[in-house]
Amino acid sequence: MMHDISQNLVEFMREIILMSFSGPDRPRLSASLMEVLAQHAVNILDVGQAVIHDQLSLGVVVESPSAQDSALLMKDVLFRAHDIGLLVRFTPITLESYHQWVSGQGKARYIVTLLARKITAEQLAAVTRIVADNGLNIDGLNRLSGRVPLEDE
């Protein structure tokens, strides 16, 4: 009984936060941010990064032991992001929402590959519309080919 109460208290106190970073990419940005997270000994629950035309987009979901720890963490992350020229947005995630996300882990996934010399917005709109019309959600979009030079028009 006492273990259940203490476990519930720990779950009540901890916070889960999505940190979304964006800005010009250059070496050591991710390392610099991860060093701040490491100083606060948070758990990394999810991470994703993409760089498009030298612009970084990085998302990190962290678990912090308490609201007080989260406040200090967010302050330090905000200052570090500012120091290295990135914008950061903090989004709280409820335990219910996190558990729901985790429970979707075993769901079927599909890969759609679009082949063309040059991809147009019209083509991508058609494919994404078909995906949405079938009740599916897009988890990621990736260009698999080399970069498209403009002189090949």
Task: Report each predicted region and the residues it spans.
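A conserved regulatory-domain signal marking ACT and ACT-like small-molecule sensing domains
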Residues: 8-153
